[in-house]
Every structure is written in structure tokens, then in C-alpha cells.
């Protein structure tokens, strides 16, 4: 979350904080005095006694039972709440890392208390925990910040006080000390949570570490915050479904936290660090996301009224790049129902001047959360087209929304009038998750749609467009660039991301033909 959390609110996840007095960090910047970040949450989030802390981690690791991953682990995610709450989940990440010989850890974390608008790479010499000091790889840090103006050497987000006991980096360190032994640390706290900042960090890390096999990139993040148990599970599984589908672009634009009891679309306080880690991992050859363990604080305490979600995840380089996104299909009846809903939604908003409220759908497919576009045509010509690229609402609600918006909010056209309603033809495109294109030769005209993004410029073309226009792959790429308001050769720019997707596309004529064929 790109906000400074209220320290009192965080007591839900770590009630022991209310009983503790924190000492401000000691720092003497004069002369050659090392700049060492002292432990701020030892004794609250985890034991301050080294022996007790070591024994607790050993016990949690021993209980983290699961098959050992054989593929190379390129990056990972671990939660950062108090060990009594998130430790049983975090242990699953660290159990997989045990025995690996990483000499450097790049630890990417969110800020909970201090607001700033850049990515803060720690400018000090060490972090300290009850298990000892962890030295900073200062040369790596200096190289990294030179890669992008979004990054700075700074102690913003790293320093802690009694009023702002930042913990998102610190909580991970005793785990790393136990499972890796000696290593150098590059601690990073992200104040700017935009996709551009996550991309800049992920790409920069991949460039520096291109031939490095001894560095671990770790994202520090919890999931949803302070919702009733059942709501939290639903929100968290949306996030984890997108993670496993490798749709980090949709994750980045849909992470949000509105406040206690107000569910966001997807939630993770370390959403930007997760996205940065995925972008890095992808460019290093990772092609699968594995969720090792999910739970929330209610599973530990038994209090289901307001919980915090946790997951342990790794990004691996597997022989097969197959994601867990299941094939999606619709029956003729479901397609017909969606088209009827689109027409009803447009007619209702044009005639009544407010959105149609459809009855709940009994179809499991129509209740799946899916991205979709609704296209309106009149006499064969485009009359409006708007959609959601991300799976943020049940499909039938997405169709209601996008049909309504296509008729009333498409900036290329005036609003649909009542006299046009009988002339409109409807087409719906139900989208798969987005996946970045690493080789344009893999783009299949008629199968893939494209989304092109470079900075603030962004444009999308559906899979049916190049077929209708009789374009080849090269022209399809150029036209998507132009749709984004960029040069026609923007797709060759290393700063341009190309995302592809597939779609289930159907119009009223298609459904009538399909229905006739089944008789």
C-alpha cells in the first residue's frame, strides 16, 4: 500500500506492540562511524533472546512439511507479521531455501509508516538482529541506483523509531540468517508502488544479475488486512490466482487497500515488491509461480472477525511454462444469456438513464471473475468498445458494466441514442490473464490479443481485430503501437512491454449459428 499505516491499526496483527517501549536507533554519522540499522521489533514480532529466536525458527521450519522443489528458485515471497502469526507460513518459503548457497539477498519490502515517492535502497553498512549483523553490499547498491531515476540511496523506509517501528525488512532477516548463514544484504523499501517503479527495479536487477546464480531476490508482503475471515480468503485467493497465472500487470494496477472492513479488489501491502520480484524472475527465466502455503491470522488465533492473510510463494524456472490458469469455455446458452444481458444493459441505460441491475446468475461460469470487452457495431461499423483487462468482477457483472460503458462512455463516439438501439449488434470477448511476450514470433494472429505499454502510453487490440483487417503479425504489432499513441515501431523498444492474451469471442450471429448446429 502506498500509504503510511496507522501504528495503532497494526496492533491487530501484533498486539504485543502495545506493551513495548522502542528505543530510537543509535546512529552517529560523524567520521567513519558505521551506519547500522538496529533491530526495532525484536521482543515483539519475534524473540529478542538469540537462543529462543533460533529455537523458534528451527521449530517452525521442522513443521513446514512439503515436497522439496527441485527446479531453480529465482525469487520468493514471505510474509512479515509477528512470527506467532505469519511464522507458520513464512517457514514454507524458508524451508525451500535451506541449504542453498546464496551469497547475496536482495530484499524488497513496502513502507508501512513513512511516505515517500521513490524506491529506497539502504545507504548504510549493516542491519542488526539478535542473531548478529548482516552486512550491506554497498557496491551493488550503488550500481543499482544508477540504473533508474526511480531509485535512490537513502534510509527512508529503513530507519525505525518508537512511533514508527518499520519491520518489513527486519522480520525476514533472522530467517535468512538461519537458513543461509553468511550473506550480504541489499535492503530495498518501495515508497512508489506504481507499475513503472516495480518494472524499473525488476528490469534493473535482471540486467545486473544476468549471469549471477548466487543471488536471491525476496519480496516481503502480507496479503489482505482486517477483513472477516471468509472475505479475506476470497480476496487472497484472487491475488494468488493472478500470481499463479503470472499476470503481474493486472496485479499491479489492481492492488489496493481501502481500509478495515472495506475490501479492495486484490490486496497485498507488499504488492509492488511482489510485482518487482516477478518482473525480475521472468527476465531471469522463471516461468512458474508456486504457492507453497496460505493461511491467515484467524487460523492461528481462532478470531475470525478481522484477519491478516499470508502466503509463501516461489518463482521457479520449470521445464514447462504452463500456468495454472484453467481453460475457459461457455455453453451456447451462457453465451446467449451474456449477449442478452449486454443488450438489456445498453437499452436500459439509454432509456432509463441509470445502470441495469441484473438478477444474480446461477451459472458457475458466469460467476467466475473474468476480464471482458463488449463491442457494439452498427451497420458493420464500430459504435463502441470498452472492457476490463483484469478479472475484477463476476463475468456477468463485467458484461453489464462494459456494455453500459461502451454505449455511454467510449470517448471516440457520442452516446448511443434510443433510435439506434434496434440497429446495434453485440459482440463479447472474454479474456484470459495477460502474459508478457518474450518472443514476438510466438504471437499468433487470430489467437492472441495484444496490450502495448510504455510509461503512460498504453493500447490494446482484441484478437479478432487483425483478422477483420487482414493484418499480418508485423502490422498487428505496429497497429497496437499506434493504438497506444506511440510510434509504429515502439514494439522494438526495450522499454515497451508487450502483453498477450487469448479470448472467447462470440457475437449474436455466432451464437445463432452455433445453436442451429446443435439441433
Regions found by a protein language model. Name each.
Residues 73-74, 170-173, 310, 369-374:
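Short glycine-rich loop/turn motifs
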Residues 175, 187, 310-312, 498-500:
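Conserved hydrophobic/aromatic beta-strand scaffold that supports enzyme active sites
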Residues 1-5:
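N-terminal secretory signal peptides that target proteins for export/translocation
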Residues 322-519:
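Basic nucleic-acid-binding interfaces
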Residues 286, 291-324:
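Long, Lys/Arg- and hydrophobic-enriched amphipathic alpha-helices
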Residues 180-184, 279-290, 321, 353, ...:
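Short helix-capping/linker segments at secondary-structure and domain boundaries
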Residues 7-8, 12-34:
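Bacterial Sec-dependent signal peptides at the C-terminal "C-region" and cleavage site
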Amino acid at each position: 500500500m502506498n500509504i503510511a499505516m496507522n501504528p495503532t491499526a497494526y496492533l491487530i496483527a501484533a498486539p504485543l506492540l502495545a506493551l513495548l517501549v522502542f528505543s530510537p536507533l543509535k546512529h552517529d554519522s560523524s567520521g567513519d562511524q558505521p551506519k547500522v540499522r538496529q533491530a526495532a521489533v525484536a521482543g515483539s514480532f519475534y524473540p529478542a533472546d538469540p537462543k529462543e529466536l533460533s529455537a523458534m525458527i528451527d521449530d517452525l521450519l521442522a513443521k513446514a512439511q512439503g515436497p522439496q522443489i527441485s527446479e531453480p528458485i529465482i525469487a520468493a515471497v514471505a510474509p512479515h507479521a509477528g512470527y506467532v502469526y505469519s511464522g507458520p507460513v513464512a517457514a514454507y518459503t524458508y524451508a525451500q531455501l535451506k541449504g542453498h548457497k546464496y551469497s547475496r539477498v536482495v530484499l524488497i519490502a513496502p513502507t508501512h509508516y513513512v511516505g515517500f515517492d521513490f524506491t529506497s535502497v539502504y545507504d548504510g553498512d549493516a542491519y542488526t538482529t539478535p542473531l548478529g549483523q548482516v552486512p550491506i553490499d554497498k557496491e551493488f547498491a550503488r550500481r543499482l541506483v544508477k540504473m533508474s531515476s526511480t531509485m535512490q540511496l537513502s534510509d527512508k523506509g529503513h530507519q525505525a523509531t518508537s512511533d514508527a517501528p518499520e519491520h518489513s525488512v527486519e522480520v525476514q532477516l533472522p530467517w535468512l540468517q538461519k537458513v543461509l548463514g553468511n550473506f550480504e544484504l541489499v535492503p530495498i523499501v518501495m515508497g512508489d508502488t506504481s507499475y513503472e517503479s516495480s518494472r524499473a527495479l525488476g528490469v534493473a536487477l535482471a540486467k545486473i544479475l544476468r549471469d549471477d546464480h548466487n543471488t536471491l531476490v525476496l519480496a516481503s508482503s502480507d496479503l489482505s488486512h482486517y477483513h472477516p475471515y471468509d472475505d479475506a480468503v476470497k480476496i487472497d485467493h484472487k491475488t494468488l490466482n493472478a500470481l499463479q497465472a503470472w499476470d503481474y500487470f493486472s496485479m499491479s494496477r489492481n492492488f489496493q487497500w481501502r481500509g478495515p472492513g472495506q475490501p479492495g479488489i486484490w490486496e497485498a501491502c507488499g504488492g509492488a515488491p511482489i510485482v518487482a520480484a516477478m518482473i525480475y524472475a521472468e527476465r531471469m527465466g522463471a516461468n512458474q509461480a508456486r504457492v507453497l502455503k496460505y493461511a491467515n491470522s484467524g487460523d492461528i488465533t481462532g478470531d475470525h472477525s478481522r484477519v491478516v492473510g499470508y502466503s509463501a510463494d516461489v518463482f521457479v524456472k520449470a521445464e514447462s511454462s504452463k500456468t495454472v490458469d484453467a481453460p475457459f469455455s461457455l455453453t451456447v446458452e451462457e453465451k446467449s444469456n451474456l449477449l442478452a444481458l449486454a443488450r438489456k444493459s445498453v437499452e436500459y441505460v439509454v432509456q432509463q438513464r441509470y445502470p441495469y441491475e441484473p438478477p444474480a446468475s446461477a451459472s458457475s461460469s458466469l460467476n467466475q471473475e473474468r476480464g471482458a470487452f463488449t463491442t457494439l457495431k452498427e451497420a458493420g461499423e464500430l459504435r463502441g468498445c470498452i472492457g476490463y483487462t483484469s478479472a475484477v468482477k463476476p463475468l456477468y457483472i463485467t458484461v453489464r458494466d462494459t456494455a453500459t460503458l461502451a454505449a455511454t462512455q467510449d470517448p471516440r463516439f457520442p452516446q448511443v441514442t434510443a433510435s439506434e438501439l434496434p440497429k446495434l449488434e453485440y459482440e463479447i470477448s472474454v479474456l484470459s490473464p495477460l502474459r508478457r511476450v518474450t518472443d514476438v514470433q510466438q504471437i499468433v494472429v487470430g489467437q492472441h490479443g495484444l496490450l502495448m505499454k510504455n510509461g503512460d502510453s498504453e493500447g490494446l487490440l482484441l484478437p479478432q481485430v487483425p483478422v477483420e483487417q487482414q493484418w499480418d503479425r508485423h502490422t498487428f504489432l505496429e497497429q497496437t503501437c499506434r493504438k497506444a499513441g506511440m510510434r509504429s515501431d515502439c514494439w522494438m523498444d526495450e522499454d515497451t512491454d508487450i502483453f498477450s492474451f487469448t479470448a472467447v469471442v462470440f457475437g449474436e450471429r455466432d451464437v445463432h449459428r452455433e445453436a442451429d448446429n446443435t439441433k
